[in-house]
Amino acid sequence: MTQTLSQLENSGAFIERHIGPDAAQQQEMLNAVGAQSLNALTGQIVPKDIQLATPPQVGAPATEYAALAELKAIASRNKRFTSYIGMGYTAVQLPPVILRNMLENPGWYTAYTPYQPEVSQGRLEALLNFQQVTLDLTGLDMASASLLDEATAAAEAMAMAKRVSKLKNANRFFVASDVHPQTLDVVRTRAETFGFEVIVDDAQKVLDHQDVFGVLLQQVGTTGEIHDYTALISELKSRKIVVSVAADIMALVLLTAPGKQGADIVFGSAQRFGVPMGYGGPHAAFFAAKDEYKRSMPGRIIGVSKDAAGNTALRMAMQTREQHIRREKANSNICTSQVLLANIASLYAVYHGPVGLKRIANRIHRLTDILAAGLQQKGLKLRHAHYFDTLCVEVVDKAGVLARAEAAEINLRSDILNAVGITLDETTTRENVMQLFSVLLGDNHGLDIDTLDKDVAHDSRSIQAAMLRDDEILTHPVFNRYHSETEMMRYMHSLERKDLALNQAMIPLGSCTMKLNAAAEMIPITWPEFAELHPFCPPEQAEGYQQMIAQLADWLVKLTGYDAVCMQPNSGAQGEYAGLLAIRHYHESRNEGHRDICLIPASAHGTNPASAHMAGMQVVVVACDKNGNIDLTDLRAKAEQAGDNLSCIMVTYPSTHGVYEETIREVCEVVHQFGGQVYLDGANMNAQVGITSPGFIGADVSHLNLHKTFCIPHGGGGPGMGPIGVKAHLAPFVPGHSVVQIEGMLTRQGAVSAAPFGSASILPISWMYIRMMGAEGLKKASQVAILNANYIASRLQDAFPVLYTGRDGRVAHECILDIRPLKEETGISELDIAKRLIDYGFHAPTMSFPVAGTLMVEPTESESKVELDRFIDAMLAIRAEIDQVKAGVWPLEDNPLVNAPHIQSELVAEWAHPYSREVAVFPAGVADKYWPTVKRLDDVYGDRNLFCSCVPISEYQ
């Protein structure tokens, strides 16, 4: 035996699990691209002056089992008290059928945002159901497919109110004083950059204030009071003031829809429809508005359209509102939202149906009535007579009550003067209520649940008669069928089968980094120690979270070359916004608040200019040269022209053209010379980790897409995480939080997300990835990602020219295939190729970004040579098909490309095409067939005939 014990223990075993090509395959690919080793290849490609001499020291790799045991020990430091804190977060009962078949199912969580609707019909249907739930509960006409959280939805409502307001000279936004404090925090942050004045006052005093363009009310106030705002809304509408209402999704099951009371915009958190609290997220927000405002709405909207055969099909509608098209003129910078969480909430509603939801809501309310009756019998006073699930109880000995609660491992809301808040939820039992009686009244209270139940059942006045819902909800068949677990399991599987996710094939989307989301990384997110914590619980109950977050932040600091990391932003777009705010506040601290010009290369991702606009900056575009690199001459000219008004540059590295620009350090130096800061977009961090770093390059701040580089799955369009890394001088200006302050982890700045650490419950995924890969594995992952991209580029460049390359004709971790010459020559477009790839079993690469008429391919390090070769063979076969069109064998108007994708029903229909059925659906090399369920979508029909709610069930049959 020649191996040592250390070798046999194989602590780096996960590295080989994560990286697709084995050593032999890597060598074959290196030979194909003309490089001797991974180090030699990256040494050729990455500019010498930015190569790290040694990898960042983030530790040795650990096995899956060792890492899980280590993280379990950390998680066990969290204390699982029963939390009645409320404030927009409650405990839930996630149905096991949804837990197992969606949250723990890679067929759902590894899919991408449904830009390619033909391979996304399942989750699009689930999202359409989510929109229908939103429409029914809010009483409005148009709903989005989720926003990031309730507080950011409030900020979006404010921005939308200004867009649609007819009071163009008004610049004040009124917020009722009993909205959740974290909502107000995020609204204030957003208002500052937009130049809005925020007024906070009692809702009934809103008419005392002048020049108000919009109002934010909360139907059930933060301390529990149900408000009937019907008359107030009517008066506000008569004055042309846009009214937004924050609502509780479970309360809406019983309460009057705000839309029926005249509200223009209604939003809230869908968390309590089955999504664990998770120390703050991720959670989906719902958002609805009147039909007349639909083109001003933020976020994704799913619409019903037709496919090429005239069959009903779903798609993302009205995308011209969004950042990837409208850039700085977009309604919002939102890119990824919260699709996976919206779909959990959607299926929660499907599984329970209207009867089940009413039973849950009524049970919560009944237990709240029982608690209220018992407390009042014993002489305690409630601050509000009307409530749904939350009581504000006035107490004399508040310290004693809180001490007894702590001894009983109970969290009450403690920030209310001379009172405590108690919010019940669907997990609350009669035993819990008895325990609350003991905490508030002492053990000898003498109260009986059944006696109290009889009293309140016949005389409950806690919901005003005018506020009781009098219309039916969720009448569509989809909410009234799938109530047995067998039916639900089959329905979810039928949706999953319609979609193409990473569990079936490579998803070669450029700028998206669709890498492995390993099972070991996913396991901890459903551990109760992580899933069940309230984000506003006392910090000493979340020591496990704090340790995990601090350790992850330390690793990210080392990997990025920055000095500090803030975990709050809950998407990449939010990270951009937070980073730009840090720059803005830094300049203001130096009495240079006039610096408001943001330079952005022409090739930038659409979120960059949209985020800059949100941060109150002016966007100035910097040209790219013929090689796709930043034009240094133009950069210097624009920087000099901006002068003392230069705030920053937003640059992506490697560039969005898939190249390591040789002059990146010079770019940083030019901007610094004129007093600006360098924002390095972390979208392409997968080509930096272990090789170089933003801080080493010379940047001041970056966001990190943990859902790209660090293995959080895309979830079909969310969740994401976008923490920001900053140099020391920017660290005091990262987001803070008004409710929670943890020394060394949060600043006193305004918040950008509802929870202090954003979507904290998915951070264990990135922790596990880094822990299992170690410094050695992380560097190798970057190197193999570069190898895979260069292998594809070298194999395809004769058939599809690679548009941009760096030194020696190399690319970074992705490559752009130029389809424009072929289109000009043959009429076949990048869209045709993208749709034909579906017939070969692949999701399309990124289309027409960053250059129109191109396909951008990013294979990631997780794809094996076998899968890469399968993709290459498919692309070469498609090129041969294009040649058939060029040669006149198939006419341009009738060939396998323009008719793609092909569906099963076509095989049994009359066949009049000049190519065979076999060529259509079993092209060369296709063995394990993926079947799309719809043909190519008719986008024009969808936008001209906008329909964004559930269609009759017969349409799906």
Swiss-Prot record:
Record flagged with keyword Oxidoreductase: yes
Modified residues (N6-(pyridoxal phosphate)lysine): K708
One Gene Ontology CC term in the entry: glycine cleavage complex
InterPro entries registered for this protein in UniProt: GcvP, GDC-P_C, GDC-P_N, GDC_P, PyrdxlP-dep_Trfase, PyrdxlP-dep_Trfase_major, PyrdxlP-dep_Trfase_small
Cofactor list: pyridoxal 5'-phosphate
Example of a GO biological process term: glycine decarboxylation via glycine cleavage system
Highest taxon listed in the record's lineage: Bacteria
EC category name: oxidoreductase
Keywords: Oxidoreductase, Pyridoxal phosphate
Catalytic reactions of this protein: N(6)-[(R)-lipoyl]-L-lysyl-[glycine-cleavage complex H protein] + glycine + H(+) = N(6)-[(R)-S(8)-aminomethyldihydrolipoyl]-L-lysyl-[glycine-cleavage complex H protein] + CO2
GO MF annotation: an example: glycine binding
EC annotation from Swiss-Prot or TrEMBL: 1.4.4.2
Pfam families in alphabetical order: GcvP2_C (PF21478), GDC-P (PF02347)
Assembly, per entry: The glycine cleavage system is composed of four proteins: P, T, L and H.
Function per UniProt: The glycine cleavage system catalyzes the degradation of glycine. The P protein binds the alpha-amino group of glycine through its pyridoxal phosphate cofactor; CO(2) is released and the remaining methylamine moiety is then transferred to the lipoamide cofactor of the H protein.
Family: Belongs to the GcvP family.
HAMAP family listed in its UniProt record: GcvP
Entry protein name: Glycine dehydrogenase (decarboxylating)
Organism of origin: Escherichia coli O45:K1 (strain S88 / ExPEC)
Lineage of the species this protein comes from: Bacteria, Pseudomonadati, Pseudomonadota, Gammaproteobacteria, Enterobacterales
Gene encoding the protein: gcvP
